[in-house]
């Protein structure tokens, strides 16, 4: 997941966003079959970013990583739970 971490940091820098923080890896609750448990997915939080900024963040990370990764900015009713999900997709 090193390429994902580097891409997230680079995208945040380019977009002038707060420093992202890894919020979930393989030691938290995820759905059955989650790639987090296989060390193939990470979630990143950027404090106080708008949904529009999150969508731009998603697009930039996806552009940097190219194919082979799924990048999703997930939004929740409680906006403090919004985060960027990045997973390696070997399919």
Model region roles, listed by residue range:
Residues 29-34, 38-91:
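Catalytic cores and adjacent binding grooves of peptidoglycan-active enzymes
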Residues 1-33:
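Extended, low-complexity, intrinsically disordered C-terminal regulatory tails
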